[in-house]
C-alpha cells in the first residue's frame, strides 16, 4: 500500500526561486532513498478561512505564500528506511542549513493511502 508524507510550509514570496531550486536538488535524493514521486505546489488559490485555513496552519505572514507538497513511497517500511538514510546522509544536512523558509512552522505527517485512482 502506498504511503505519503505530506507537508505544508510558508515561504517568503521573494524566495520562490530559491525554494524551487532547493526542492529540485532534493527530489533526486528522495528518489534515491526510495520515493516514487515528489510533488511541490505553490499557492495560487488559497482562500482565507473563518476558523482555519492553510495560511493560519503555518502562521504565514503577509509576505509569505503557502507550499503544499507530498512525497509518495511504495510502503511505510520504505519510507521509514528512507528517513533513516536521509538523517545520516551529509547531502541532506546541507539543505537544513540553507532552507529558504522557517522550518519551525512547517506541518507534516505520514499518511496511508486509502484511495488512489
UniProtKB/Swiss-Prot annotation:
Q: Which gene encodes it?
A: ybaA
Stretches of the chain forming a coiled coil according to its record: none
- Database matches in InterPro entries: Dimeric_a/b-barrel (IPR011008), DUF1428 (IPR009874)
What superkingdom does the record give? Bacteria
Q: What is this protein called?
A: Uncharacterized protein YbaA
Q: What is the lineage of its organism?
A: Bacteria, Pseudomonadati, Pseudomonadota, Gammaproteobacteria, Enterobacterales
Amino acid at each position: 500500500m502506498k504511503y505519503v508524507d505530506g507537508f505544508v510550509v510558508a515561504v517568503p514570496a521573494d524566495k520562490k526561486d530559491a525554494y524551487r531550486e532547493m526542492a529540485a536538488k532534493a527530489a533526486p535524493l528522495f528518489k534515491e532513498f526510495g520515493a516514487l514521486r515528489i510533488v511541490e505546489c505553490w499557492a495560487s488559490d488559497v482562500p482565507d478561512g473563518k476558523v482555519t485555513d492553510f495560511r493560519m496552519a503555518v502562521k504565514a505572514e503577509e509576505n509569505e505564500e503557502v507550499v503544499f507538497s507530498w512525497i509518495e513511497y511504495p510502503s511505510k517500511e520504505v519510507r521509514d528506511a528512507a528517513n533513516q538514510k536521509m538523517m545520516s546522509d551529509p547531502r541532506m544536512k546541507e539543505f537544513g542549513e540553507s532552507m529558504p523558509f522557517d522550518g519551525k512552522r512547517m506541518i507534516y505527517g505520514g499518511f496511508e493511502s486509502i484511495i488512489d485512482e
